[in-house]
């Protein structure tokens, strides 16, 4: 899955040149999202990248805890391989995402 997420990151970075991205190495702090973004409106936010080959989205307990503690300005972006789509959820949806998987209504539209 690591190779899939690395490829997803490269594609995502190319498709979002208007955002300044910093890739975060997670060996320092477990659960910290993969990306720190900064947009043209002057806002920082984090994104956890996931590649799902089924309805289930796999998140570690540390990743879940991060989004529970930081429900705002945090996102989980899932590449749904089976249905060829991107699904973005806001951090506060993390528990629902675990319970419902990709059948959960997407939290952000237009990506």
Question: For each predicted feature, which ranges?
Answer:
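Acidic-basic catalytic patches of nuclease active cores, encompassing PD-(D/E)XK
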Residues: 1-26, 40
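Short, charged, amphipathic alpha-helix that recurs within catalytic cores of restriction-modification
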Residues: 52-79
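Structural signal for conserved beta-strand scaffold positions within catalytic alpha/beta enzyme cores
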Residues: 23, 48, 76-78
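Helix-rich interaction surfaces within compact, conserved domain-sized segments
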Residues: 93-111
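Beta-rich catalytic cores
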Residues: 31
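Nucleic-acid nuclease catalytic cores
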Residues: 69-96
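Histidine- and/or cysteine-centered catalytic micro-motif in compact active-site loops
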Residues: 24-27, 50-52
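Conserved catalytic cores of phosphodiester-cleaving nucleases, focusing on short active-site segments
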Residues: 35-37, 43-53
